[in-house]
Amino acid sequence: MGTAGRGVDKVGYSTPSVLENKMVYLIGAGPGDPGLITVKGLEFIKQCDTIIYDRLGTYQLLEMVKPDCRRIYVGKQAGSHYKKQPEINEILVEEGRKGNMVVRLKGGDPFVFGRGGEEVTALLEAGIPFQVIPGITSAVAVPEVCGIPVTHRGTSRSFHVITGHKRADIHRSDEGGLDDYDYIRNQEGTSVFLMGLNRLPQIMERLVQTGAEEHTPVAVISKGTMPGQRIVRGDIQTIADKVNEAKLESPAIIVVGENAALDFTAPNRGPLQNVHVGLVGTPKLREKMRVAIDALGGQSYSIVDMSVEQTEEKNRLRVALEHIEDYSWLAFTSQNTITLFFKWLREWNIDVRKLAHLKFAVVGAGTR
């Protein structure tokens, strides 16, 4: 892919150009917190014509798309797939052939147990241009927000990411993948299992069978980086019962090794620590509130989306502007009225210098 038409901004990354963005973008949404998506990934989401998403993609990121963006839900979640992978591949190819800017939003990173390779293969075979935008994998980020480093001097020089799913064509027994567990037995470091909550007892049993000590620390983290995040700690012998008692839900990851006993969380993350806040308002207002709440240590999520709709008063405004010289003051009652007013001025090709004789009155700090 060429670089013609691409601009470089002050922070040193390439921004998307209208001339080159008509292709399919596989974008990693990160571990769950919408603030953890990459800057580049968010820019493409804001511009796309079609977005294909599933449960693992952050729903709050859908609020960033254009109003006319087409949304296609493909419904992947633990134990239930609304669309199977071959169907998703077909949708990607079909949408890519339309010549629009298409985003495939995937949880975590597309190439870390995200089946991104299968989707790329389908696009390659169909001759559809594409680009992969990496995401932050939950295998590292989720333990980190809970104070667990996957590597740490003196306890773990490596980490290993394993799928908790069982595939009959790979695993040799009902207990799990012998290749995976035999490999873990011969390695030092931290083991991170993704998508393994429903098979937690079998995974722990298999680890013991291949030589792991029953008192090896284990942490299970549910809904990491998202509202409702919970962590249960124990060891290989006790963790299954503790998780069952706590009724943890998917998505969840399992961390096994000495580092699972570490807790490097900050003692006080702010006055809103452990407080969940539901946001109501327009996308711009909710984003402003989200940033403020996050800075105080709280967790926020959108519960109601609101939008500003124009009324018949727009026509009355246009008539008034034709006689603007008869007015002395112009009053704005909110930030939204200012945005709409100057948007309409541009639509009507009215020179803002016609307002030079007016005095302005505004209500609220946001209108200043």
Q: At which residue positions do the language-model features occur?
A:
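Beta-strand->loop->alpha-helix junctions that form or flank phosphate-binding loops
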Residues: 72-75, 134, 217-225, 301-304
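Class I SAM-dependent methyltransferase SAM-binding "motif I" and its flanking Rossmann-like core
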Residues: 33, 107-187, 232
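Short, conserved phosphate/pyrophosphate- and ester-handling motifs at nucleotide-, phospho-/glycolipid
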Residues: 135, 196, 364
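Short gly/pro/ser/thr-enriched loop/turn and capping motifs at secondary-structure boundaries
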Residues: 59-60, 78-80, 137-141, 158-161, ...
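Short, conserved loop/helix-junction motifs that constitute active-site signature segments
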Residues: 46-47, 64-66, 184, 208-215, ...
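Class I S-adenosyl-L-methionine
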Residues: 2, 9-34, 39-136, 141, ...
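A contiguous loop/helix-start segment that scaffolds small-molecule binding in enzyme catalytic cores
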Residues: 2, 13-16, 22-24, 97-102, ...
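Signature of uroporphyrinogen-III synthase
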Residues: 32, 88, 226-251, 258-368
